[in-house]
Amino acid sequence: MIDDMAVPLTFTDAAANKVKSLISEEENTDLKLRVYITGGGCSGFQYGFTFDEKVNDGDLTIEKSGVQLVIDPMSLQYLIGGTVDYTEGLEGSRFTVNNPNATSTCGCGSSFSI
């Protein structure tokens, strides 16, 4: 785990609070939010979010408000400088990534290219 001064990715209060709420609903305090990147989508790469109980060797862990965000090293290289947030709007509620490394994104924002 690293301190706030050296964090290469921002984990917003809104995202941390939603993770805390979901973990409480699941009644499993070992859960962490994992963000990852896979190939696919209309722009080449897409973001994924899942809950995970374990942290693998090399994973970056960011803690906020008592919950953890976990990123694998391969995904982290594409996410440096980005922000993981949680938004609620007309199109629904979801975790989002604001990624300054993306040169283009699809209309829904779920995939991107570099």
UniProtKB/Swiss-Prot annotation:
InterPro entries associated with the record: FeS_biogenesis, FeS_cluster_insertion, FeS_cluster_insertion_CS, FeS_cluster_insertion_RrpA, HesB-like_dom_sf
One GO MF term: 2 iron, 2 sulfur cluster binding
Cofactor-binding details, from the entry: Binds 1 iron-sulfur cluster per subunit.
Domain of life the protein comes from: Bacteria
Cofactor: iron-sulfur cluster
Keywords, ordered alphabetically: Iron, Iron-sulfur, Metal-binding
Gene3D superfamilies documented for this protein: HesB-like domain
Keyword Iron-sulfur: yes
A cellular-component GO term for this protein: cytosol
Chain residues that bind iron-sulfur cluster: 42, 106, 108
One Pfam family here: Fe-S_biosyn
GO biological process: iron-sulfur cluster assembly
Metal-binding as UniProt keyword: yes
Record's function text: Required for insertion of 4Fe-4S clusters for at least IspG.
Quaternary structure annotation from Swiss-Prot or TrEMBL: Homodimer.
Family that this chain belongs to: Belongs to the HesB/IscA family.
Protein name: Iron-sulfur cluster insertion protein ErpA
Native source species: Haemophilus influenzae (strain ATCC 51907 / DSM 11121 / KW20 / Rd)
